C-alpha cells in the first residue's frame, strides 16, 4: 500500500513523505490514527501544494516541543512507596504515574503514552525514563523510588558521588 504521511512517524518518515508500507500496517494503524492518507493522484497533488504548510506546522510543533524538553531536562521525580524488607514494591510505578507527576512538575500535560519504560519499576532505586516528545526528539528524566524522603535523598547523594567519580576518571 502506498501512503502519504500527514504527521511525523518515528522510524518511518516525516510529513509529506510518500512511502510503501504493508497493507495491514497502513489499514490498521496509519490510516485510523490519522497519521497518513492513501497515495492517490489527487492526494499527491494536494500534498505537493500543501507541503510548505505541513513543514511550517511541523517546525512550530518542534519549537514547542523543544521548550517542553528544556522544562523536562534534569527533572527528578521522587516516588515514596511501601516496600517489603528486600526493597520490592507492593505494586509498581506505572507510566501513567510518571506522566502525572511530570505534568504536575512542569505544568504541561504529558500523555502516559509518551512515557517509555524499558521494564516495570518494581523495586526501590534510581531509574532513567525516556519521554517521547516528538517523532525525532526524546527527553530523559530520573525516577527515584524510595521508602522515605530521607532514603530518596541518600539515593540522590549516591548518584551525585558516582557522577563526580565518573567525571574524575574521564579527566
Curated annotation (Swiss-Prot):
GO molecular function, one term: structural constituent of ribosome
One cellular component term from this protein's GO annotations in UniProt: ribosome
Any one of the GO BP annotations: translation
Keywords of the record: Ribonucleoprotein, Ribosomal protein, RNA-binding, rRNA-binding
A Pfam family of this chain: Ribosomal_L9_N
PROSITE patterns: RIBOSOMAL_L9 (PS00651)
UniProt xrefs under SUPFAM superfamilies: L9 N-domain-like, Ribosomal protein L9 C-domain
Keyword rRNA-binding: yes
Top-level taxon of the source organism: Bacteria
Function: Binds to the 23S rRNA.
Protein family according to the UniProt entry: Belongs to the bacterial ribosomal protein bL9 family.
Protein name: Large ribosomal subunit protein bL9
Amino acid at each position: 500500500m502506498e501512503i502519504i504521511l500527514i504527521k511525523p512517524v518515528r522510524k518511518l518518515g516525516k510529513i509529506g513523505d510518500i512511502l510503501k508500507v504493508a497493507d495491514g500496517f497502513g489499514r490498521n494503524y496509519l490510516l485510523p490514527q490519522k497519521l497518513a492518507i492513501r497515495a492517490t493522484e489527487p492526494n499527491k497533488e494536494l500534498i505537493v501544494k500543501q507541503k510548505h504548510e505541513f513543514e511550517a506546522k511541523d517546525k512550530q510543533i518542534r519549537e514547542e516541543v523543544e521548550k517542553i524538553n528544556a522544562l523536562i531536562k534534569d527533572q527528578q521525580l521522587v516516588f515514596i512507596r511501601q516496600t517489603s524488607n528486600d526493597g520490592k514494591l507492593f505494586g509498581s510505578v506505572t507510566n501513567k504515574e510518571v506522566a502525572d507527576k511530570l505534568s504536575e512538575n512542569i505544568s504541561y500535560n504529558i500523555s502516559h503514552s509518551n512515557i517509555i519504560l524499558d521494564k516495570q519499576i518494581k523495586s526501590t532505586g534510581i531509574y532513567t525514563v525516556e519521554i517521547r516528545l516528538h517523532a525525532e526528539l526524546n527527553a530523559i528524566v530520573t525516577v527515584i523510588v524510595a521508602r522515605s524522603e530521607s532514603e530518596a535523598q541518600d539515593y540522590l547523594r549516591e548518584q551525585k558521588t558516582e557522577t563526580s567519580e565518573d567525571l574524575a576518571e574521564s579527566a
